[in-house]
Every structure is written in C-alpha cells, then in structure tokens.
C-alpha cells in the first residue's frame, strides 16, 4: 500500500483520500501492527505519509496511550499545516470514542499545553463544539474552555479560537455576547480574537 500511495505524492492529496487510505490500511493489517506502521509512515519526508500516519494514530489513540502521547509530543511539532489539520481531526476522534464528557480532563490537559499546535488541535478539532455530545447541552463550558486562549501569542491559535466562538454564536448569540463583553479590548491580541468571535453578533 505504501508504494501505491507513493505514486500519488506529487499530487496534492485531499483529506478524504487520506481518510480512505487509513480505512484501507486498518482493514488490511493486523491491529497489533498499526502503531509501528504509523511510526514508519510518519518518518517519511512527504507530508501525505505523515498525514496518513496521524490519522492512523488517531484511530489507535482511542485506546492506546502511546499513540496519544506521540500525537501530542511529536506530531504537534510537524511544520506542515496539513499534518496539523489531521492532528485536530485525530484528537476529535479520540474524544468521540471516549465520550466528550469523559474526555474533559484530556481536553483540559491539551488546552494547558505550551505548544500552540496542541491547543489548536482541541479548539479546531472539536468544531463545531456545540454539535458534539455534552457540549451541545453545556455550551457555556465549551465557551469557557475555548475563550481561555483569546490572548495567546500565536495568531494561528487565536484565529481558531475566534472562529470556534463564532460558530457557537450562530445558536448561542447571548452566551457569546456575555463572554466577549468581559474582554479587555485594549489588548490587540484580544481585539483580534474579538473581531472573529463577534462577527455575527448584532
């Protein structure tokens, strides 16, 4: 399968093709081989292989803490933005499998990390937050978790924070309005996030 993927490397690979490739591998290999295979794929210089590896690790990390640790510590420092998009999807895969309420300690752990890519895997991966079980019934918890990083030094992360809050404002405008009214808009970082989060508010 690796060889067949290699033939397609010059072409920009859509995310859904990566997901299809992961499903094919998961059905073709014994589960005990997945982790080593994912590590081998992640060592490849072509980002498509690392995207595929990240997807596989996300499936494994639902039950395998070594895979979860690799996602957090190694995948998160990959320089390719596409790999970081797959990390966000992988994190959501883990939370979906374990249950979003049961995953709250894990969500908070990642949100408290020093690496903005780890934090963004949460803020971006769980979008739209209030369509997820638990957060659908508890939008205020989602808003509080996301809003913690409104002033983060990473513009890349603040953009994700603002967009995630804007998503929620479509159904919970008053909750978002209450949140952003407390923000210190003289801080240019917070103002940047505010403009995204409050974009749909009247």
Describe each PLM feature range:
Residues 4-202:
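Alpha-helical scaffold domains
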């Amino acid at each position: 399968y690796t060889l067949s993927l290699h033939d397609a490397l010059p072409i920009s690979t859509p995310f859904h093709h990566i997901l299809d490739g992961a499903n094919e591998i998961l059905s073709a290999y014994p589960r005990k081989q997945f982790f080593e295979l994912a590590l081998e794929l992640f060592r490849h210089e072509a980002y498509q292989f690392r995207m595929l590896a990240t997807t596989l690790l996300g499936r494994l990390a639902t039950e395998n803490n070594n895979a979860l640790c690799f996602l957090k510590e190694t995948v998160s420092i990959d320089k390719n933005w596409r790999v970081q998009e797959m990390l966000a999807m992988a994190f959501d895969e883990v939370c979906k499998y374990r249950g979003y309420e049961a995953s709250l300690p894990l969500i908070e752990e990642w949100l408290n990390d020093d690496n903005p890519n780890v934090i963004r895997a949460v803020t971006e991966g769980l979008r739209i937050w209030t369509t997820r079980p638990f957060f659908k019934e508890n939008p205020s918890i989602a808003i509080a978790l996301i809003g913690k990083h409104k002033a983060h030094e990473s513009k890349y992360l603040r953009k994700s924070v603002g967009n995630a809050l804007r998503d929620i404002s479509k159904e919970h405008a008053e909750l978002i309005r209450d949140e952003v009214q407390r923000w210190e808009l003289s801080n240019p970082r917070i103002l940047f996030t505010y403009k995204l989060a409050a974009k749909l508010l009247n």
